């Protein structure tokens, strides 16, 4: 696609495109060499491994680092599918298509997110069962969460947690409500996409999987 754009062979709504990263949807008329083409042919999805200590946003009034400080200029117009907070890590999906973003974020589409979570203290069976039934805290109702202990000691516990929604700071809020602190939070999967061995601060292009 970038090669076609550099050769000025693509038009959107009659205007020649001279840079990548333009958001398009079904409402746009896209042409390649004066022939109409389906808009999804230009859809792009990237996987990015977000490090701790950066924001999922294009800019920050406090001048804190954002994920776009790690990405090349050609991806500066990409939009994120979901978010991770400043101190969370792991998989972020990026796309140039707002319809794809909405598809993955809408709760009714039920895309699973999987996290590895480190908490201070011990997580017992009672907590695991409570998560499985759904959790209510700070006047917010959270859907059932499947959690399992990966490893533990007297001081900490590593969990894998499977969620079907993406409420703001969901995992952190749940553990705060039972006086436990999350010290690491890493998303390893979102729907059909997995973090795999992608290194921190690195990205790769992926095929669209509905």
Task: Label every model-predicted segment.
Residues 2-210:
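Basic, flexible Lys/Arg- and Gly-enriched helix-loop patches that mediate nucleic-acid binding at interfaces
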């Amino acid at each position: 696609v970038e090669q076609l754009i550099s050769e000025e062979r693509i038009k959107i709504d009659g205007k020649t495109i001279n840079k990548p990263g333009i958001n398009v949807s079904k409402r746009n008329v896209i042409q390649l060499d004066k022939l109409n083409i389906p808009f999804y042919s230009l859809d792009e999805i990237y996987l990015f491994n977000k490090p701790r200590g950066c924001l999922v946003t294009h800019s920050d009034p406090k001048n804190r680092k954002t994920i776009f400080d790690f990405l090349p200029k050609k991806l500066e117009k990409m939009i994120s599918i979901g978010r991770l907070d400043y101190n969370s890590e792991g998989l972020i999906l990026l796309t140039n298509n707002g319809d794809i973003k909405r598809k993955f974020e809408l709760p009714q589409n039920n895309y699973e997110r999987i996290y590895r979570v480190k908490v201070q203290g011990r997580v017992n069976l009672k907590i695991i069962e409570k998560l499985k039934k759904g959790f209510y805290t700070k006047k917010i109702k959270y859907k059932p969460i499947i959690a399992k202990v990966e490893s533990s000691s007297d001081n900490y516990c590593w969990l894998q947690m499977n969620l079907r929604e993406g409420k703001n700071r969901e995992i952190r809020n749940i553990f705060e409500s039972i006086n436990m602190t999350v010290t690491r939070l890493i998303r390893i999967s979102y729907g059909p996409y997995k973090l795999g061995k992608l290194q921190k601060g690195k990205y790769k292009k992926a095929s669209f999987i509905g």
